[in-house]
């Protein structure tokens, strides 16, 4: 079997807290950009595990339409607030579906925030400034939240079937997915004489309980685990190497910067910096290129666009 080109995974941009990331995968042979992009996107959204509250218990409340004396918000509003809670439950301490309880009991007049919750070991609240409820004069908030690790989305009706639901507990909708947004795009890429290649770009935003790069890694692991059942149907095929060793055309990398059709200003800056070939250019990181004397933003953009159009990228910092 003719082997496929080995693609390279590159981090293009990352948020300061790492809950956002933009990544590229190239070169891919024609058709694999959409194939991989769509599969990873759907797996990220539907199957990435996370933590969520699925039920609550409030002293004085028997259902979600109750109003509690001394609490400004009714139970419906409190539930809406709780559904915005971002949790991280340590999977090395708690097994799948193991329930943890987050509690608060307060009679102090004023707002109660997520950061006021009493947490068991291995449980973390990431948005501690989230308002849970407001206690007025003479009020008492006695609240227990029931949370666990799982995946997907479950309605309050689904959660009524949980085995540990007891009288007095109010089930709520639970969204276990830590993924807020996934987008992908596919562009053409070129390496040497090969012009029918593709570049996949992925953008992932999470709720902060997992980094964007870890989310992609987990989603990919889930995909591969399911595909292995098909691979193992034939032992001979299961050991077949279908991805080749990365053999970027040396002649392509040895092209001089004069051959890359840069404007004279960009060309002069590169030459003064001792960059004479494409190989020398892509061994620099973007900060090193940007710090070249007299290289302005327009020239930097020109150089970045040229490198990207060749299906290449600068060295990561």
UniProtKB/Swiss-Prot annotation:
The gene is rpoA. Residues 1-234 are annotated as: Alpha N-terminal domain (alpha-NTD). The keyword Nucleotidyltransferase applies. The N-terminal domain is essential for RNAP assembly and basal transcription, whereas the C-terminal domain is involved in interaction with transcriptional regulators and with upstream promoter elements. One of its GO terms (cellular component) is cytoplasm. DNA-dependent RNA polymerase catalyzes the transcription of DNA into RNA using the four ribonucleoside triphosphates as substrates. Belongs to the RNA polymerase alpha chain family. Homodimer. The RNAP catalytic core consists of 2 alpha, 1 beta, 1 beta' and 1 omega subunit. When a sigma factor is associated with the core the holoenzyme is formed, which can initiate transcription. This is DNA-directed RNA polymerase subunit alpha. Pfam families: RNA_pol_A_bac, RNA_pol_A_CTD, RNA_pol_L. Its EC number is 2.7.7.6. Residues 249-317 are annotated as: Alpha C-terminal domain (alpha-CTD). SMART domains: RPOLD. Keywords: DNA-directed RNA polymerase, Nucleotidyltransferase, Transcription, Transferase. It catalyses: RNA(n) + a ribonucleoside 5'-triphosphate = RNA(n+1) + diphosphate. HAMAP family: RNApol_bact_RpoA (MF_00059). It is an enzyme of class 2 (transferase). GO terms for biological process: DNA-templated transcription. GO terms for molecular function: DNA binding; DNA-directed RNA polymerase activity; protein dimerization activity.
